[in-house]
Each structure stands twice: as C-alpha cells, then as structure tokens.
C-alpha cells in the first residue's frame, strides 16, 4: 500500500422520484469524483446499476482501510451480507424495512464483527440530514465524522529548520534510531512519531505495534496504547494516518480502477 492512500466504501442514496430510496454500495479512492461519475452514467465511468437513475447522493462513507483489498472485501460483504460467514447473525431484510435502513443495520453489525472491528476506520456522514444512530454503535476507537473528507495535506518539510533559510546544507548523515529497538531507521521506512508536543518518539511500525499489543497477546493489529515516550494515550489509527500524511505522494495518475468486477459481467 502506498502512503497517503484513501480507500473508502460508500453508500449512495437515489433522489430520483421514480427510484427514490434505492441505494448502492461502492468502493472509491476519490469520493467527489466518484459521485460525479455515478450521476454521469456509464459513459462517465458510473456503475451500470446507477446509470440513468440519478441523481444520486453519497450520504455515507467508511474510510481508513489499510489497503484497497481490505476495502473491497468490506464492500463485497456489505453488498452480500447473506453470503458472508461473518454476518450470518444479521438476518435478511425485514418486511417493511426500508433498503436504506437495512444497509445501515448491516453496517452496524459489520463494524462490530471481525476482522473489521479492529481496523482504524472512520464512519463519515457526508449528508448530516441522513444521519441515523447505528445499533449496535461503532466501537469506541472508530470516530464519527461529518462533511467531506479533509483534503490531503502536502508532505511536511521534515528536515526544514533555521539553517534552511540561512543557506546552509542540511546534515546528510543523521543517524535516526528507533526509540524502542535502537536500530537505525532506514530511508525507505516511515517511522511512527508521537504527535504530542515535546515527545521525541520515533519507532518502527512493528516495534510500536508489539509494544501496544503486550496487553492483547492474541491480536495482530493494535487499537490504542500509551506512548512509551510521554505516556499519553494514542490511537493506532491516528498514528498510521499521520505517518501517511507525512509521506504522501500524488496518485492521480495511478488511481485504482473503481468499477466493481461484477459490473464487467454486464457489458
């Protein structure tokens, strides 16, 4: 996975009076562009299930997946809950239950089921007027957000300092070491850094994960833990997000194909 990638699984709601209430679940790396494609039809890159039935509104998106594969698996399970062994307890759509309400019910159980329950996901309502409380509610480490995803920030000048403006050459051979294992951090590695002011923690992802998982030896992915440096509480998802923001690259030319593979069967 490239640093700074955005992988989201969204819920569309149809506003067309002839098809009002229909929904569509999809995957995207660019929410704003994707909803334009849906409303533009197949010729603009929209899905065949949404083509000619617009306008569509993207009302909800779940993001923070560690990879495109993880997001696509989440998308598939949300689309086919009866076929997912993780969601056999959810049950079918009830008589009189709106399609939108059913998809929210499925989502609520997905966020509480493994493997998704341990991912650093964010539940974001793009349209606050569509918001409904999920039952059961998301885990405490999954924040609830509103509005469009924040724009991608430019990479920070990690080596910038007073000397940069003075015309001095930056130091080239600085030996930066992991706070936990004391081994050197290689140039190609993106260390995790504590965001709290005054804390100098810089650590390998694996080293900090092992530190956080000491209280949960049976797990592979941490949720949160105390910073070994300043002892402040840290959410694992926040650390990963900050790490990506600091090493982000432009991906407009290498964007993943967003059309679901099942759509290809209809062409």
UniProtKB/Swiss-Prot annotation:
Its cofactor is a divalent metal cation. Residues 5-90 form the GIY-YIG domain. It is found in: Nucleus. One of its GO terms (biological process) is double-strand break repair via homologous recombination. Its main location: nucleus. Its EC number is 3.1.-.-. Keywords: DNA damage, DNA recombination, DNA repair, Endonuclease, Hydrolase, Metal-binding, Nuclease, Nucleus, Zinc, Zinc-finger. One of its GO terms (cellular component) is Slx1-Slx4 complex. GO terms for molecular function: 5'-flap endonuclease activity; crossover junction DNA endonuclease activity; zinc ion binding. CDD domains: GIY-YIG_SLX1 (cd10455). A zinc finger (SLX1-type) spans 178-230. Residues 139-157 have a biased composition (Pro residues). Forms a heterodimer with SLX4. Catalytic subunit of the SLX1-SLX4 structure-specific endonuclease that resolves DNA secondary structures generated during DNA repair and recombination. Has endonuclease activity towards branched DNA substrates, introducing single-strand cuts in duplex DNA close to junctions with ss-DNA. Has a preference for 5'-flap structures, and promotes symmetrical cleavage of static and migrating Holliday junctions (HJs). Resolves HJs by generating two pairs of ligatable, nicked duplex products. This is Structure-specific endonuclease subunit SLX1. The lineage of its organism: Eukaryota, Metazoa, Chordata, Craniata, Vertebrata.
């Amino acid at each position: 996975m490239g640093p700074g990638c955005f992988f989201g699984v969204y819920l569309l709601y149809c506003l067309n009076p002839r098809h009002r209430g229909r929904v569509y679940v999809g995957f995207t790396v660019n929410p704003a562009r994707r909803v334009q494609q849906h409303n533009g039809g197949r010729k603009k890159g929209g899905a065949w299930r949404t083509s000619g039935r617009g306008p569509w509104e993207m009302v909800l998106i779940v993001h923070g997946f560690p990879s495109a594969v993880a997001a696509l698996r989440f998308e598939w399970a949300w689309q086919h809950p009866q076929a997912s062994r993780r969601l056999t307890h959810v049950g079918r759509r009830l008589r009189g239950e709106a399609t939108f309400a059913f998809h929210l019910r499925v989502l609520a159980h997905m966020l509480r089921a493994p493997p998704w329950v341990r991912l650093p996901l964010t539940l974001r309502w793009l349209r606050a007027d569509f918001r409904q409380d999920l039952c059961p509610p998301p885990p405490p480490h999954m924040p609830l957000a509103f509005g469009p995803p924040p724009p991608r920030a430019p990479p920070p000048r990690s080596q910038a300092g007073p000397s940069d403006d003075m015309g001095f050459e930056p130091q080239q051979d600085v030996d930066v070491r992991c706070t936990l294992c004391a081994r050197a951090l290689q140039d190609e590695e993106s260390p995790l850094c504590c965001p709290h002011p005054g804390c100098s923690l810089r650590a390998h992802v694996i080293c900090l994960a092992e530190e956080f998982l000491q209280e949960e030896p049976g797990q592979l992915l941490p949720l949160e833990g105390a910073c070994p440096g300043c002892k402040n509480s840290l959410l694992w998802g926040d650390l990963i997000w900050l790490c990506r923001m600091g090493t982000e690259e432009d991906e407009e030319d290498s964007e993943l194909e967003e059309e679901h593979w099942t759509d290809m069967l209809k062409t």
